[in-house]
């Protein structure tokens, strides 16, 4: 039943990477389960993190994957945005709010190799790629005999470097391969031994804090446990 004055058409902003689009489409599918009349228009927005090819730890990381998208929300060019929670800064623009955190994926990191090695069993001298300083430090601390190399690119690009044997392994978030439906040999890294990034595996849906209709619509897929 459509309520009088109910808003049914929304525009949202997201990065154009395969993972960002997969996350966004998952959110839209969940929202449509709450109301099949909802219609969404996706606007792909390029961020600084998409165009700067330096290793992430050489960049000023605050807002590199979300600032341009949040600006579009704030300026009312889009109604809401879907982010990885770990990319959201601790302080948002005063006009914005995290309207919803839907069901969270695993927070663990994984090691991907062609052989399915664990971090304990991967041979000494192997080269392991990581886009994150946090992961690089933890790999080196646990296995100082490995060569840790900065690696950029979307998840498929990084995995292909392993398949093509340009690198022996990569460490990335399990949530990424789960959301993309990527079937690849991997070893799950224990959170006790390999601390994930705060908010890893969770999504944050951002909208304007005075947009009560959008907030009400988004709250329907809030997962309190996440």
Predicted regions located by residue number:
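Ordered, amphipathic secondary-structure segments that act as subunit-interaction surfaces
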Residues: 76, 83-88, 202-211
């Amino acid at each position: 039943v459509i309520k009088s004055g109910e808003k049914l058409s929304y525009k949202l902003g997201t990065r154009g990477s395969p993972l960002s689009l997969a996350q966004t489409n998952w959110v839209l599918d969940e929202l449509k389960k709450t109301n099949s009349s909802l219609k969404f228009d996706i606007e792909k927005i390029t961020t600084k993190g998409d165009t700067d090819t330096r290793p992430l730890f050489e960049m000023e990381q605050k807002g590199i994957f979300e600032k341009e998208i949040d600006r579009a929300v704030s300026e009312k060019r889009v109604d809401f945005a879907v982010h990885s929670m770990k990319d959201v800064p601790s302080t948002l623009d005063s006009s914005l709010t995290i309207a919803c955190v839907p069901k969270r994926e695993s927070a663990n990191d994984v090691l991907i190799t062609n052989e399915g090695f664990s971090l304990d069993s991967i041979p000494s001298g192997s080269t392991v790629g990581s886009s994150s300083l946090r992961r690089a430090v933890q790999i080196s601390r646990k296995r100082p005999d490995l060569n840790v190399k900065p690696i950029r690119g979307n998840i498929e690009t990084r995995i292909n470097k392993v398949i093509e044997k340009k690198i022996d392994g990569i460490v990335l978030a399990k949530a990424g391969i789960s959301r993309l439906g990527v079937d690849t040999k991997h070893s799950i890294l224990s959170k006790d031994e390999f601390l994930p990034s705060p908010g890893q595996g969770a999504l944050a849906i951002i909208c304007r804090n005075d947009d009560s209709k959008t907030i009400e619509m988004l709250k329907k897929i809030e997962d309190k446990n996440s």
